[in-house]
Swiss-Prot record:
This is Large ribosomal subunit protein bL35. Keywords: Ribonucleoprotein, Ribosomal protein. The gene is rpmI. GO terms for biological process: translation. The keyword Ribonucleoprotein applies. Coiled coil: none annotated. It comes from Mycobacterium marinum (strain ATCC BAA-535 / M). InterPro entries: Ribosomal_bL35, Ribosomal_bL35-like, Ribosomal_bL35_CS, Ribosomal_bL35_sf. Residues 1-42 have a biased composition (Basic residues). It holds the Pfam family Ribosomal_L35p. The keyword Ribosomal protein applies. Belongs to the bacterial ribosomal protein bL35 family. GO terms for molecular function: structural constituent of ribosome.
Length: 64
């Protein structure tokens, strides 16, 4: 059986932490920011963990 390939789109969007959690960037922070409030853009800053329902699916895309 050939080697399993990592899903290249998922590898660009998700990272695995040292403890095994999967993290992602928050949406709505790329462009058209001038009409979004500073409070909203601060809230969208940084990374967050992937929802528990999605972790199994994302791990399979990342060959885990």
């Amino acid at each position: 059986m050939p080697k399993a390939k990592t899903h290249s789109g998922a590898s660009k969007r998700f990272r695995r932490t040292g403890t095994g959690k999967i993290v992602r960037q928050k949406a709505n922070r790329r462009h058209l920011l001038e009409h979004k409030s500073s409070k909203r853009t601060r809230r969208l800053d940084g990374r967050t963990t992937v929802a528990a329902n999605d972790t199994k699916r994302v791990k399979s895309l990342l060959n885990g």
